[in-house]
Amino acid sequence: VRPVFLLSFLGACLSVATFAATDPLERLKSFSEFPAVDLRRLHAGDILGEPGSLMNFPQGISAQTCFAVPVTAEEAAKRLLVWDPSAHETLKAIAFHPVSEPCQAVDFQNLNLRSNKRSFLWLLDKTRATTAGESELNLTRDEARQLADCAKENPDPQAISGCWAKLLLERVTEFQRRGFSGVPPYEATGETVSPAAQLRAMLREQPTVAGEFAPLLEKCGVLGDEEAATLKPFHYWGLYEANHHATFVLGVVYLLPLGDHYQLLDAQYYVSGTYYTFVTLYEIWPTRVGEKSEALVWRGDFIAAPTLAFTKGFDRLAYGAIMVQEVKKAIRSFQDDVKVKNR
């Protein structure tokens, strides 16, 4: 059962202003990798997928997908806003939890690293190996010092879980105060990396996509004047397996109603290791095929990771193709959840 605050949050997000109705197929032609879309095939279950064009930004790749779900556009937006992927083992989402605003220590009470799984042991080992001056994890220098002292005091997995809970709580608190401008950089690996700057760099690589989502990106403070950010997000924390590594993430999902259609941004503004940030954009329209009414969804995914800086040409294209397949897995899982709830 979802907390009551989610229900009130959804109601506030779906207060709709008046905009002219849009032709989704014309919109897709204007900004996406899909100049022609067969709605009947999508309604029958097909998922379109294409790797994004190669970026000049050395650490990023992207992918675009398009699919349909058998609910209204409004309902699809509501479900994507708070969708929990952890029920699907193939998605490697170990845990997923909503975070209240203002956040509280109780939001992280289920954080537990006690496990014999290889992915957990990697995170525990890297946490214990962290020093005040160095870490393989994505931390500020102060966080590295804090985590090193905490783990040295008690290296037990349960105690280390508490160390991480405190660190994540502090990061969420800072984001809730200052938004993307308050996201601290990663420093402990020896170079300074801003996940917020990487997010913006990837979006600027695809100006037609950034232009399509300008209303949303400006209202959540990703692009333009951050002082103009007015949207309230859904906050969450998660624990994922990324490249066999247990990886904490802190994320936000913003929803902007635009008349008959909706835009969403799901941004992981903190990732504990393996990659830097992951961003997903959605645009959702109402469509009809015969007597059937469904939601048409365009999805764009962007990931920044240090290993991508060493890939070029064919290797980078291969990563993009793999990304499309992984995104399709997540879409299938979401579609399955929608179908189950509609029974």
Regions inferred by a protein language model and the residue ranges of each:
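Terminal "cap-and-tail" regions of soluble proteins that handle hydrophobic small molecules
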Residues: 21-75, 81, 85-343
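Bacterial N-terminal signal peptides
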Residues: 4-17
